[in-house]
């Protein structure tokens, strides 16, 4: 029997082979990203668009991403917000989140200058995880 595991890990879109990796890199609307890159993106947003002393995104744009939209006060520009503390009670009101399919989350927590990345978290475990993470960030 021929071993096709690696051949089957790719799909062809047009004339290009694209990885289709079960169990790890899909996030949100088809974004393929590692946990490390998720953290880097979160850090870029925590740092108001700066990286390595340069602005990669305008700071005003990043701030606007965290402003609630009129029809959904818990949502900004591709960011979930926690202003009233109801979405994620364990997080600060300044926290924002990028949430993806399968429990993938990038939690941007300015109150502790922290970015927390979670992958494949069962939604029933989210609040407990966040309580423990916030306690660890507080040093207790």
Identify the function of each model-found stretch.
Residues 32, 87, 124:
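Acidic-and-aromatic substrate-binding clefts and catalytic sites of carbohydrate-active enzymes
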Residues 1-47:
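Active-site-proximal helix/loop microenvironment
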Residues 36-40, 60, 128, 132:
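Extracytoplasmic/secreted proteins, especially bacterial periplasmic and envelope-associated proteins
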Residues 29-50, 104-120:
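Active-site-proximal alpha-helical segments within enzyme catalytic domains
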Residues 97-140:
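Structured C-terminal helix/loop/strand segments within mature extracytoplasmic catalytic/sensor domains
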Residues 49-57:
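Structural helix-adjacent loops and short alpha-helical linkers that scaffold large soluble proteins
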Residues 44-48, 68, 136:
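Structured segments of extracytoplasmic/periplasmic soluble domains
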Residues 6-25, 63-115:
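Active-site Gly/Thr loop motif
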């Amino acid at each position: 029997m021929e071993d096709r595991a690696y051949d089957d890990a790719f799909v062809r879109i047009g004339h290009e082979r694209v990885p289709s990796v079960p169990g790890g890199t899909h996030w949100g609307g088809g974004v393929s990203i590692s946990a490390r890159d998720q953290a880097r993106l979160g850090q870029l947003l925590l740092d108001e668009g700066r990286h390595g002393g340069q602005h990669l995104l305008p700071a005003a744009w990043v701030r606007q991403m965290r402003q609630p939209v009129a029809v959904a006060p818990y949502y900004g520009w591709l960011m979930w917000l926690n202003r009233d503390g109801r979405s994620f009670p364990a997080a600060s009101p300044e926290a924002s989140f990028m949430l993806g399919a399968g429990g993938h989350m990038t939690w941007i927590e300015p109150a502790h200058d922290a970015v927390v990345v979670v992958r494949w978290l069962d939604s029933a475990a989210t609040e407990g995880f966040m309580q423990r993470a916030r306690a660890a960030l507080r040093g207790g």
